[in-house]
Amino acid sequence: MYKILFATSEAHPLIKTGGLGDVAGILPIELARLGLEAGIILPAYPACKTHLKNLKEVARLRLPAALEPVRILKGQLLEGPNPVWLVDSPAHFDRPGNPYLNEQGQDWPDNAARFTTFCRAVATLANSPEFDWQPDLIHCNDWQTGLIPPFLAPLRSRPATLFTIHNLAYQGVFSRQQFDALELPSAWWSPAALEFYNQISFIKGGLVFADWLTTVSPTYAKEILTPEFGCGLDGVLRGRSKRLTGILNGADYQRWDPRHDPFIEKRYDQTCWSHKASNKLALQRRYGLPEDDTLPVLGFVGRLVEQKGIDLILGALPKLLAEKIQVVFLGEGEERHQNALQQLASRYPNQIGVSISYDERLAHGVQAGADIFLMPSRFEPCGLTQLYALRYGTVPIARRTGGLSDTIVDATEKNLRQELATGFTFTESSPSALLTAIQRALACYAQSRQWRRLALTGMAQNFSWQTSAKAYFDLYQQLVSQEFSCKNNVL
């Protein structure tokens, strides 16, 4: 059976900052269940070393622009069948902060060098006869792995490459000075290669040189071909549109299911949906709000940035707070949004609760305890939290974009009658459009029988990773059966 090497900058439970970590944590496991040999390779952050068993050195690589040899460590997940390799370069990865930011929340100034070293190591290892686990395909993810396809592209015999765009807005763009310092091929400094408005774009390396591209939802695959969502790369993507597929991310129902969630006050399912009220009371206690299980509680879990529509929520709140509702927030992000929320919580202590952090336990508590989940993203490649909300019977309100369009059925009168509706959607990216959608939801909430049917329809949806993994499995088979060599003469 084929060997797939999943190259990523984060993977749960080793290290996670967002949705990529969730995907990298579950997709290789699901691929293994389908019979593939699926390994994972990522940088050797300190946290990764503590979460692996049987960790040992299997190779040492001397790479251009690296002052010291790079060690390759191999280990095994504590749970799961997948082998894991770590690219151990202490000067690049053994440091505090998260994979991309320092403790002050700023980009590491040497991110270009850090992830060039990672990409060089993966490309060298995967095509080395000394490596005892030769992959048939390397599955690259986001800009941090964007140099792997161009490193491999000119080789006569090499693994196939697949590049997944999780969020096109994050591109790994660096200066010409950094490009020169990295000792990269001079031919890469070209509009046909990695040059991007007189800078180098790591993500463009993946977009131009990978054998196939995927995004994390069918709608986002269409959106990024347009100037509105293409982030300056829509022309490149239109040129590769015949080799671009949208595969919807799945939800990890082992971790996110109210039937067996260890983090919530009272477990429940569709047959005992009334137990959700106990979780609402627990959530109100956690945020110091008056306990009243008849009040509609709206929840937001996510980064406090404009992409996630936090400014739309802030714009809608003054009118919204005239209603008998409560709103809870969990997340961190731009300081101005954090301050605005904290000021509102001080002004409306009985209606607004704020936690400026990311707390996994509390995230589960919000999903279980809220009635309505707010997700007014300006763009959303896929989104996972709306999938969790559906499973927990927490009705999502979302802007009709990306994966939100693919996973939420709007509660029109017709869809409600046919018991197809799962949430409320809106199109215009404005506080007034969001407010209208919330008011629609509150009107439905007042009709308890209709609301219960709506929530239970959402709970019955199945966005499991088995479906997504099978789509990747089929695509891998197609790519591995083809032969690739010297695909781009600019190299």
Curated annotation (Swiss-Prot):
InterPro entries in the record: Glyco_trans_1, GS/SS, Starch_synth_cat_dom
Cited Gene3D superfamilies: Glycogen Phosphorylase B
Catalyzed reactions per annotation: [(1->4)-alpha-D-glucosyl](n) + ADP-alpha-D-glucose = [(1->4)-alpha-D-glucosyl](n+1) + ADP + H(+)
Record's keyword annotation contains Glycosyltransferase: yes
Pfam family, one: Glycos_transf_1
Keyword terms, alphabetized: Glycogen biosynthesis, Glycosyltransferase, Transferase
GO BP annotation list: glycogen biosynthetic process
Annotated positions binding ADP-alpha-D-glucose: K16
GO MF term set: alpha-1,4-glucan glucosyltransferase (ADP-glucose donor) activity; alpha-1,4-glucan glucosyltransferase (UDP-glucose donor) activity
Broad EC category: transferase
Listed pathway(s): Glycan biosynthesis; glycogen biosynthesis
This enzyme's EC code(s): 2.4.1.21
SUPFAM superfamilies recorded: UDP-Glycosyltransferase/glycogen phosphorylase
HAMAP family the UniProt entry points to: Glycogen_synth (MF_00484)
Family to which the UniProt record says this protein belongs: Belongs to the glycosyltransferase 1 family. Bacterial/plant glycogen synthase subfamily.
Function summary: Synthesizes alpha-1,4-glucan chains using ADP-glucose.
UniProt-listed PANTHER family: ALPHA AMYLASE DOMAIN-CONTAINING PROTEIN, GRANULE-BOUND STARCH SYNTHASE 1, CHLOROPLASTIC/AMYLOPLASTIC
Name by which UniProt lists this protein: Glycogen synthase 2
Organism for this UniProt entry: Nitrosococcus oceani (strain ATCC 19707 / BCRC 17464 / JCM 30415 / NCIMB 11848 / C-107)
Encoding gene, per UniProt annotation: glgA2
